[in-house]
């Protein structure tokens, strides 16, 4: 075996071992990221919404801090409805387009359409309401009751 092939094989093995310790990102969240950036025309990335208010990000409780946080609560509720329909919203891949008027769905199955609609409505909602930097990375144990 050539030394270059051995190096390549070693690099692949090391990267696979390292990747096994990293939790997988739910597949559809990658698509949701693109929908958010499409809807707000690149003004904010999805990372701005990953730890905003009481509902944007992992989990959620209490009263939303503003209209933008309410968008996240509504998105969580939409995903809960998708699960009741037997869908797996965080794993469901769907077809969508980013046009001049923002994102829209073009999926075939009921679950794909439902989950995509949840994500498009949330992305449009994020674009509609102002972002308050004071509501990013808040102390949820104090403010989300």
From Swiss-Prot:
User: Which keywords annotate this record?
Assistant: Calcium, Disulfide bond, Hydrolase, Lipid degradation, Lipid metabolism, Metal-binding, Secreted, Signal
Which GO molecular function annotations are given, in alphabetical order? Answer: calcium ion binding; calcium-dependent phospholipase A2 activity; phospholipid binding
* Signal peptide feature range: 1-21
Q: Name one GO biological process term.
A: lipid catabolic process
What is annotated as the active site?
Answer: 75, 119
What EC number(s) does its UniProt record assign?
A: 3.1.1.4
Question: May I have one GO cellular component term?
Answer: extracellular region
Report the protein's function: PLA2 catalyzes the calcium-dependent hydrolysis of the 2-acyl groups in 3-sn-phosphoglycerides.
Q: What is this protein called?
A: Basic phospholipase A2 PC16
């Amino acid at each position: 075996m050539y030394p270059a092939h051995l190096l390549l094989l070693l690099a692949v093995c090391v990267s696979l071992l390292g990747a096994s310790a990293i939790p997988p990102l739910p597949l559809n969240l990658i698509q949701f990221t693109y929908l958010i950036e499409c809807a707000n025309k690149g003004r904010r990335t999805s990372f701005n919404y990953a730890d905003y208010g009481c509902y944007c990000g992992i989990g959620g409780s209490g009263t939303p801090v503003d209209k933008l946080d309410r968008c996240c609560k509504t998105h969580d509720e939409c995903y809960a409805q998708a699960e009741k329909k037997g869908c797996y919203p965080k794993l469901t891949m769907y077809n969508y387009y980013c046009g001049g008027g923002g994102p829209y769905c073009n999926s075939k199955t009921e679950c794909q359409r439902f989950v995509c609609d949840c994500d498009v409505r949330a992305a449009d909602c994020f674009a509609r309401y102002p972002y308050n930097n004071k509501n990013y990375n808040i102390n949820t144990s104090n403010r989300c009751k």
